[in-house]
Regions:
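A glycine- and Lys/Arg-enriched "phosphate-lid" helix/loop adjacent to the NTP-binding pocket
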Residues: 349-388, 395
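Phosphate/diphosphate ligand-binding glycine-rich loop within oxidoreductases
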Residues: 2-104, 199-201, 205-207, 211-217, ...
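Glycine-rich adenosine-cofactor-binding loop
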Residues: 7, 89-94, 101-102, 106, ...
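NTP-dependent small-molecule kinase module
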Residues: 244-255, 260, 276, 280, ...
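Adenosine-phosphate binding glycine-rich loop
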Residues: 31, 195-258, 399
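NAD(P)-binding Rossmann-fold cofactor-contacting core
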Residues: 131-149, 289-291, 295-296
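Rossmann-like adenosine-cofactor binding region
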Residues: 148-216, 337-343
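ATP-dependent small-molecule kinase phosphotransfer cores
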Residues: 290-348
């Protein structure tokens, strides 16, 4: 192996994609489940340069002949370069987190910062916050140690913090939907930063957005930034414009990996347009209504007849949460998906939402849709749901012309979303 990543578990790593997109060299993922395997690998030194992830960022320091002062102060190395048999250790997580905060206008000067978690990434983010002038940095733990000045999550809510940083795995794929801090009860918050990058928006970030926190950002751009700075060490050269490269690769990753969800009234064209979009973009097509039928074994009219709309909506939420946490899908949603906020969180966590807007007079009546029994029913439904569609959507796609027109409008909207 020349270049690559070592760690105990690497199943969901994006590092290979990022490095090969950035530099074109072959980048291996090398899982080393045990400490013995990690030590044997490091002792052989049969690589040019590697990145190191959990749980070996501290262990690798034992094998380094030189450790960058910043990495030494943090107590963790995530980038190792082999120079004629001598290992040189650096910490580009610091640089990546600093870039993320700078890029999104997070100002630490004079602020109170709470950091969720006590692991290695805590030390990295704490160093950045202190170096950028934070007045106070507080540590939050599920099992706080008063002798270390640690706070509980309940105490963090009343800490007066302006900035929250999450360094725990709470809300990380596949265990999405977890949020241990009530950010809505922290009115002075200016920024919430989560180092978790899968899903794109954790439950913490989604709730911060709902609470109106000015800056709420996940960790994907940090991941890309630390990789770019690691590649500079790998190749012993600076990129001409690293921030531009970071933005380019982050946008490309989101475009490639995020879901696209289509919402709108029954018979507005979500399924037909969705299949075309999925084919054009190379995504897996998912029809949530079809998945409900597959899982339950009954038709939608039969579910409504037996359990009512509430029973159907519960099943709809289950399927939305099942598919919403995955990636690279085109998801066609039922017309009533917007009636439950948890559905929208599930769709937004790892995707963008397009509202397919078709004139109500062009919608179909009946057709096995229990709530579309008449045109009057459709008009009433549209009046109730339209504000919800508009609030949920990242873009509105008119569908009052040809299918090609709608497809073109959707592609243009996606370009604008992913390139912004």
């Amino acid at each position: 192996m020349e270049y690559g990543l070592i760690g105990a578990k690497l199943g969901h790593s994006y590092s290979k994609i990022i490095h090969e997109m950035l530099c074109g060299y072959h980048y291996d993922l090398c899982p080393l489940p045990t400490e013995e395997e990690a030590r044997a690998f490091l002792a052989k030194r049969q690589f040019k340069a590697i990145n190191v992830t959990i749980p070996y960022k501290k262990l690798v320091m034992e094998y380094c002949s030189y450790i960058d002062p910043r990495a030494k102060a943090i107590g963790a190395v995530n980038t190792v370069v082999n120079k004629n048999g001598l290992l040189y250790g650096y910490n580009t997580d610091y640089m990546g987190f600093a870039h993320l905060c700078d890029a999104h206008g997070v100002s630490f000067a004079g602020k109170t910062v709470v950091i969720l978690g006590t692991g290695g990434t805590h030390n990295t983010t704490s160093a950045v916050a202190r170096d950028k002038g934070a007045a106070k940095v507080l540590t939050v733990s599920r099992h706080p140690d008063p002798e270390k000045g640690e706070l509980s999550y309940a105490e963090a809510v009343s800490s007066g913090a302006q900035i929250v940083i999450n360094t725990t795995p709470a809300g990380m794929y596949p265990n999405v939907g977890v949020c241990n801090l009530d950010v809505a009860a922290m009115p002075g918050l200016e920024a919430v930063v989560d180092v978790v990058y899968n899903p794109d928006k954790t439950e913490l970030i989604l709730r911060a957005e709902e609470a109106g926190v000015p800056v709420a950002v996940g960790g994907l751009e940090m991941l890309v930034a630390q990789a770019v700075y690691a590649a500079e060490y790998f190749l012993d050269r600076k990129f001409e414009d690293a921030p531009v490269e970071i933005r380019r690769i982050t946008a490309a990753l989101r475009r490639d990996m995020l879901n696209i969800a289509l919402i709108g009234m029954p018979s507005c064209g979500k399924t037909t347009l969705g299949r075309l979009l999925a084919k054009s973009l190379g995504r897996t097509f998912v029809d949530l209504d079809e998945e409900i039928v597959k899982t339950d074994g009954r038709s939608i009219p039969d579910i409504f007849a037996a359990e009512g709309e509430d029973g159907f909506r519960t099943k709809e939420t289950t399927e939305t949460q099942r598919f919403g946490k995955e990636g690279r899908q085109l998801i066609s949603c039922g017309g009533g998906i917007v009636k439950k906020p948890e559905n929208l969180r599930a769709l937004h966590q790892n995707g963008v939402i397009l509202f397919i807007d078709r004139p109500v007079d062009a919608l179909a009546v009946g057709g096995g849709r229990p709530l579309s029994s008449s045109m009057d029913a459709l008009r009433q439904m549209e009046a109730q749901r339209r504000p919800l569609y508009l609030a949920a959507a990242d873009a509105v796609i008119p569908n009052n012309g040809t299918l090609d027109d709608a497809l073109h409008a959707a592609m243009e909207a996606l370009d604008e979303i992913f390139d912004s």
